[in-house]
Amino acid sequence: MWVTVGYRSFSGRRIARHRAHGYTGETGGTTTSMTTANPGRSGGHAATQAAAQAASQVADIAVEHVADIRGQVHDAIVEAKPKLRGWLHAATAPLALVAGVVLVSLSPTSATRTGSAIFAASAVLLFTASATMHRGRWSPRTNTVLTRIDHASIFLLIAGSYTPFTLLLLDGAARTTLLWLAWGGAAAGIAFRVVWTTAPRWVYTPVYIALGWVAVLFADDFFRHGPVKVVAFLAAGGLLYTFGGVVYGLRRPNPFPSWFGFHEVFHLLTVAAFATHYLGISLATYALR
């Protein structure tokens, strides 16, 4: 797909405003030449002031050019989104809320209720933030804010998914250490994405995946205390999230770009991973009843 961004998008009112400030000619589609006032008795001082004013006006035009181009690029990207972008997460958000309420209400202990509530809340936040960002038509500034929230929510869901499994299956130092690693890593990841919003995918996608596999360090503890089925669901959910991260990073496969592209494949895998973890947490929770 080719996205053509024009440079001649100034409105008549903007051009009139530039000419009112002394711009009379056009070069390459933008008004660049200026009339310089006679310095008169002020001599060189007046000429310097005129040059400074002209430079300021040229800078203003350049800023407006950049804003125009960014706006046009953003609009083109919005138009190029697959038609199903965001709908999977939009549909999953209310389902995750209902499923979370059921899980919390059936949890027999305060620890299981806490873990289930954190898991459900982080999932609802992620799916809601993702759907809001992808389904709306936002200004570039608003889209940047929503993107930060969306990416931060991924870290929260990783830590939120660890929490109930850790509270249910681990104890002692292993429980404390894994919770600190999960939530400390999530906090660091959120700070990283908020500060470096333009980081390339190949930089931040492995960070998500690495944090998602911290549990491997505690594999013996999970197998020692947890039913095999529960640990299998934990691992399967992690694999699905990992496959989703790989698809997101590589932008492949991209089956139907106009309807269901690589990003929709990524979203589908995240929904499947959430459902898998939900089943694992449910099995572990109901086993305590």
Residue ranges of model-derived segments:
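Compositionally biased, low-complexity segments
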Residues: V5-Y7, G29
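Aromatic (phenylalanine/tyrosine) cluster motif
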Residues: Y7-F10, Y23
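Multi-pass alpha-helical transmembrane bundles in non-GPCR membrane proteins
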Residues: R14, H18, Y23, G28-R289
